[in-house]
């Protein structure tokens, strides 16, 4: 393979070679666009749109459009794109991932493909990792788009509904992955189409694409309402977990799982008074126990989470920041609260959910950019159909990457790191020190204080100062300790006299599970041809080496008889570290693939429900759909009641009539003798005929317009109620499905099969409820739509979107008669689910 690459070049090099003629065309137009006035450049937008309307493709106008953006960029923000930046822009337009090193100007690169694709009028989303970067990038690049007559907006967390609608209606919209995803879910929960904020999802350019599409892929977006379950059992299960001894359970650090062994199971049966712990009827107890074990023996305080003011806060494993407002799902957060002795919050009920994998796959075209993507190319290709093109740097990289230094113990390693920082500080050379956890950054900070080294520590709390601190990290004599990805998206520029000292020194205190995260830390130095250096310090006590490192390496170190403060550097050690990282990356990829397998089941179901919901919202005439629904329901009911066994036929007919009376048939209007001698098809026709007559009567009773709105009101309410219950049921199924492996069933296949059966059942119940309500409807006031659930929150931040008021007529009181005509009070009928 290496010989092939030497002769023919790598895949990226060959693809860049193919792109070069387009870059040459853009370059050739440079003098021509320089001669145009600002107004003439602005008019180019209208010209391009006309050409697209006449059938030209985006690819055919690309050279001119890119040349225009390049010139306008120079005139408005003083930045002219290099040839390498144009290559990156073309790669993005082609729906691929551009790997561009830190400092190569990715924010500017996105402007040309965003402009070109915005000409279609279908909108472009530019996705960043946080609100600060979204606003900064929008404010920085807006002059370019506005000079060309395009509108550019930004979505920020605390925006109102009308502000969001305005931002999404712009040609180009900046925002974060979570805001875009939650708006999509919320749009599919609205009850009036005017409340929707997003347009159809057209083209997304994802900045820091590896962070969003890979690191965040295991965290689904969840909108939830308050659940009904008691929290007391979390405390009971926690008491059980704490009573166990080491020999009662087994921790699998590779799989991040913990399970009871035989002695632990016996103790569980005694503790919970069970005959057989493994019985399916004990599934709920098993769930509480598993989460309590995970909370106590896997989740670590100040690494995975922090406790602050009586609240458990998640710490992002990649950025080291506290994620206020976000909670672990599936009861794990409650289990940690029980472990830490703080108030156990009620478990929430999932109302809407989607993974980033499935959200971003909705876009017609997806692309991205990052400094590090190549190590995950297989995953990008497999999950998203994206290939990674490494874009050459504008200037050669002058950073020197030294081999890893390996110590026997963490104590010896940190002493060596502190000594190295001290020597670097004395020399005046700036140092950026990357740590993997809050605990480690605080340990190192204490060591530096004792040595009298002034330094900045960045961990856990994201604030706008973070970008300033990181940007200052290249100044003379500065020492900055930060989690590996802190301040991502901010360039570190070297201060006066730093080049002569060797540039910014990067010190990694531990190898991360992913090579990509290590490469990101390294990439903070050596920006745009600047000098720099990097080195990682590793100990055999580090999690990576302890869990995934080879026994052979441990044996060699033992034989060498290394002391704590002695280090080794060797190719074999470096290879062992890289192999350990590859193992973890493969493991994590498998986990994400499995999660996607599960999510694809509910994703197909979600698409069907959201499409049906959208048709209802758009005000389509549902009369024919309702008629089909009635026929389909009646056919199903008759087929399920009549088995074809002659001796049971009479009894089945009686039960069928009783069931039909419960759904819509007026009592005693159909007698047993009326249908006992009819064929199955004739029985169906008779019941369909009764239903149509009742429906025709309703059409006469109300105006046709009223009847169409009644259909929409009822269908929306029924679909929302049933879908939310179904999501919850699917969550329970997923939780329990792992036990199928003990029955020689493949869990993912069992989930797919049973999930499909549950979906069919939900569709049947939607038809049943809709027909039932429609047949009994009696209106005393104009039909009005109401949300099924009113108080909802997201799993990322407390949901503070300000809703634009929509005028409503007076709502139905809880104790009023239900407008569906059942004769019951509203709170005991349709209002039961509100």
UniProtKB/Swiss-Prot annotation:
Residues forming coiled coils: none
Annotated positions binding Zn(2+): 818, 820, 829-830
SMART domains for this protein: SecA_DEAD, SecA_PP_bind
Name listed for the protein in its UniProt record: Protein translocase subunit SecA
Membrane topology: Peripheral membrane protein
Family (UniProt): Belongs to the SecA family.
Reactions catalysed, as given in the entry: ATP + H2O + cellular proteinSide 1 = ADP + phosphate + cellular proteinSide 2
Enzyme Commission number: 7.4.2.8
Record-level GO cellular component terms: cell envelope Sec protein transport complex; cytosol; plasma membrane
Quaternary structure, from the entry: Monomer and homodimer. Part of the essential Sec protein translocation apparatus which comprises SecA, SecYEG and auxiliary proteins SecDF. Other proteins may also be involved.
Keyword vocabulary terms for this entry: ATP-binding, Cell membrane, Cytoplasm, Membrane, Metal-binding, Nucleotide-binding, Protein transport, Translocase, Translocation, Transport, Zinc
Record localization: Cell membrane; Cytoplasm
Top-level taxon of origin: Bacteria
């Amino acid at each position: 393979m290496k010989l092939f690459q030497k002769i023919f070049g790598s895949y990226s090099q060959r693809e860049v070679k193919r792109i070069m003629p387009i870059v040459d065309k853009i370059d050739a137009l440079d003098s021509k666009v320089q001669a145009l006035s600002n107004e003439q450049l602005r008019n180019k937008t209208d010209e391009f749109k006309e050409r697209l309307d006449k059938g030209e493709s985006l690819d055919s106008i690309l050279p001119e459009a890119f040349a225009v953006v390049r010139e306008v960029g120079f005139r408005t923000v003083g930045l002219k794109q290099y040839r390498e930046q144009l290559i990156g822009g073309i790669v993005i337009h082609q729906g691929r991932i551009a790997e561009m090193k830190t400092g190569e100007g990715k924010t500017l690169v996105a402007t040309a493909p965003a402009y070109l694709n915005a000409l279609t009028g279908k909108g472009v989303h530019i996705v960043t990792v946080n609100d600060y970067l979204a606003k900064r990038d929008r404010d920085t690049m807006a002059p370019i788009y506005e000079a060309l007559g395009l509108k550019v907006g930004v979505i920020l967390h605390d925006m109102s509904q009308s502000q969001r609608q305005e931002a999404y209606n712009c040609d180009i919209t900046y925002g974060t992955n979570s805001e875009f995803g939650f708006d999509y879910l919320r749009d599919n929960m609205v009850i009036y189409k005017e409340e929707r904020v997003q347009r159809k999802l057209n083209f997304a350019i994802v900045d820091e694409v590896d962070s969003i599409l890979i690191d965040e892929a295991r965290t689904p977006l969840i909108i939830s309402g308050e659940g009904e379950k008691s929290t007391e059992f979390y405390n009971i299960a926690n008491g059980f977990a704490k009573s166990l001894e080491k020999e009662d359970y087994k921790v699998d650090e590779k799989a991040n799982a913990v399970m009871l062994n035989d002695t632990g199971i016996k103790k569980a049966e005694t503790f919970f008074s069970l005959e057989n712990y493994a019985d399916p009827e004990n599934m709920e107890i098993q769930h509480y126990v598993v989460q309590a074990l995970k909370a106590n023996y896997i989740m670590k305080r100040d690494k995975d989470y922090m406790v602050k003011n009586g609240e458990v806060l998640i710490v992002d494993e990649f950025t080291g920041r506290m994620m206020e407002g976000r909670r672990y799902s599936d009861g794990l957060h409650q289990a940690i609260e029980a472990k830490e002795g703080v108030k156990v919050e009620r478990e929430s009920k999932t109302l809407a959910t989607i993974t980033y994998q499935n959200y971003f796959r909705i876009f017609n075209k997806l692309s991205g950019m990052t400094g590090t993507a190549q190590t995950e190319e297989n995953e990008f290709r497999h999950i998203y159909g994206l290939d990674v093109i490494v874009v050459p740097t504008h200037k050669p990289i002058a950073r020197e990457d030294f081999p890893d230094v390996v110590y026997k113990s963490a104590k010896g390693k940190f002493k060596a790191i502190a000594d190295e920082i001290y020597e670097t500080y004395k020399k005046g050379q700036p140092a950026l020190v990357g740590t993997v956890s809050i605990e480690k950054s605080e340990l190192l900070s204490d060591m530096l204080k004792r040595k009298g080294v002034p330094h900045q520590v960045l961990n856990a709390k994201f604030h706008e100062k973070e970008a300033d601190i990181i940007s200052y990290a290249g100044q003379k004599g500065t020492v900055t300790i930060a989690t590996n990805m802190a301040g991502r998206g901010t360039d570190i520029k070297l201060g006066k006299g730093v080049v002569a000292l060797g540039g910014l020194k990067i010190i990694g205190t531990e190898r991360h599970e992913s090579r990509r995260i290590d490469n990101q830390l390294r990439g903070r130095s050596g920006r745009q041809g600047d000098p720099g250096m990097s080195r990682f310090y590793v100990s055999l006590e580090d999690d990576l080496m302890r869990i995934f490192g080879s026994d052979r390496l441990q044996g060699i170190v033992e034989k060498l008889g290394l002391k704590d403060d002695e280090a080794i550097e060797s190719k074999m050690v470096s290879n062992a570290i890289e192999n350990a990282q590859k193992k973890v990356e493969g493991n994590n990829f498998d986990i994400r693939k499995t999660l996607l397998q599960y999510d694809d089941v509910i994703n197909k179901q979600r698409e069907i429900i959201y499409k049906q919901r959208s048709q209802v919202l758009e005000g389509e005439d549902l009369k024919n759909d309702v008629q089909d629904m009635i026929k389909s329901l009646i056919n199903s009911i008759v087929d399920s009641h009549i088995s074809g066994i002659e001796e049971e036929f009479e009894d089945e007919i009686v039960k069928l009539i009783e069931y039909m009376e419960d759904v819509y048939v007026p009592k005693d209007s159909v007698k047993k003798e009326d249908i006992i001698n009819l064929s199955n098809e004739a029985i169906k026709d008779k019941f369909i005929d009764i239903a149509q007559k009742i429906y025709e009567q309703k059409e006469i009773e109300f105006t046709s317009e009223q009847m169409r709105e009644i259909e929409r009101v009822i269908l929306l309410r029924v679909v929302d109620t049933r879908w939310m219950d179904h999501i919850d049921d699917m969550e329970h199924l997923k939780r329990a499905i792992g036990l199928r492996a003990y029955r020689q069933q493949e869990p993912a296949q069992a989930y797919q099969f049973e999930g499909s059966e549950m979906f069919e059942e939900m569709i049947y119940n939607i038809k049943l409820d809709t027909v039932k309500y429609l047949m009994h409807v009696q209106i005393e006031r104009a039909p009005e739509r109401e949300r099924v659930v009113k108080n909802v929150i997201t799993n990322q931040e407390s949901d503070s979107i300000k809703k634009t008021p929509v005028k409503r007529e007076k709502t139905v009181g809880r104790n009023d008669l239900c407008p569906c005509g059942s004769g019951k009070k509203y709170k005991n009928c349709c209002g039961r689910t509100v």
